[in-house]
Amino acid sequence: MSKILVIDIETKPILSYHWGLFNQNISLEQIKEDGGILCVGAKWLGGKNCHFFSEWEHGQEGMLTATHALLSEADAVVGYNSTSFDIPRLRGRMVEHSLPPLPNLTEIDLLKTVRKLGLTSGKLAYVGPFLKIGRRY
């Protein structure tokens, strides 16, 4: 049986100094603190336990190391916009912390499926109620 991991990350913003609010081009020299991954939530499909790793509880390296271990066990990874956002962000931060490259992952990005439906919006706040899934249903 395949091991399928459902995953989501939350990120923090880039902090910068700049001189206005309209039409700003922020240079690298203006960045005070680079944004990064704040936390990772993951659950094995069919499993009962959720895994939660955070910068404040595990530190950046601990969070990434634990996430790397889960992803390395997975036959496939499921997420929402994960192919364009979550997985590349994780790969980049893992390189930053000298973790070994992740194995090739079979990625199932649910946003790609939702886009085929031609809905008004692909945002989860719209898709959940439209499909009658989520906390309220």
Model regions: which residues?
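Conserved DEDDh/DEDDy metal-dependent 3′-5′ exonuclease domain
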Residues: 46-130
